[in-house]
Amino acid sequence: MSDPAEVPTASPLLETVGLACERDWRMLFERLDLRLAAGEMLQVVGPNGSGKTSLLRLLSGLMQPTAGEVRLNGRPLAEQRGELARSLLWIGHAAGIKGLLSAEENLTWLCALHQPASREAIWQALADVGLRGFEDVPCHTLSAGQQRRVALARLYLDAPPLWILDEPFTALDKQGVAQLETHLAGHCQRGGMVVLTTHHSLQQVPAGYRELDLGALKAASGATVEPALGDPA
């Protein structure tokens, strides 16, 4: 990664203020001040156990911080519980789909929880991720990579502006990885935001790519750290 550069001055749409996370009586990180604006991609890196997934879950509203708060569009996340589905999309490390349902049924169910989608839109999204002809196939018969594609098809529907993705490239083949990289970069170029963890070395990133090293944050004993602009590691 290149040397840290000046942090963009665009108004942050996602920010944390004094964020701290403790798990099993161990402080993973603290005093984290993070700002992310439209068009930016933040890759969270760090050794195992540094709190990467915990941070993503905090940003998604799936966990409560030990201290501090997360703000989305200038408002505390805790005040937006009923609105989060319109503002952010979380896809975790596991595919999160139901094996007895077909690919189409899984997407219909997932979209109904957030933003309902037409059958035509769902079929097109499945085609976009290379699953044309698998719409009615029970997901338990699909490979791990195909199941991952079903989950990622949500990114090709009417998705919210903020995407929070935990290891999205897991189980994807080379073609699937390249396609997803292009799609994520395009989302940022259109004014969206992406926060992700991945062990994959990114080859395509938007101009607003940034990196947050939780290992460095821990080594600094919780000092406030701004993510650095830079090339993917």
UniProtKB/Swiss-Prot annotation:
UniProt topology in membrane: Peripheral membrane protein
GO BP terms in the entry: cytochrome complex assembly
Catalysed reaction equations from the record: heme b(in) + ATP + H2O = heme b(out) + ADP + phosphate + H(+)
Main location group: membrane
GO function term, MF aspect, one: ATP binding
Keywords, in A-Z order: ATP-binding, Cell inner membrane, Cell membrane, Cytochrome c-type biogenesis, Membrane, Nucleotide-binding, Translocase, Transport
InterPro entries for the chain: AAA+_ATPase (IPR003593), ABC_transporter-like_ATP-bd (IPR003439), ABC_transporter-like_CS (IPR017871), ABC_transptr_haem_export_CcmA (IPR005895), P-loop_NTPase (IPR027417)
Chain positions recorded as ATP binding sites: 46-53
SUPFAM superfamilies from the UniProt entry: P-loop containing nucleoside triphosphate hydrolases (SSF52540)
Subunit field text: The complex is composed of two ATP-binding proteins (CcmA) and two transmembrane proteins (CcmB).
Name used for this protein in its record: Cytochrome c biogenesis ATP-binding export protein CcmA
The organism's taxonomic lineage, starting at the top: Bacteria, Pseudomonadati, Pseudomonadota, Gammaproteobacteria, Pseudomonadales
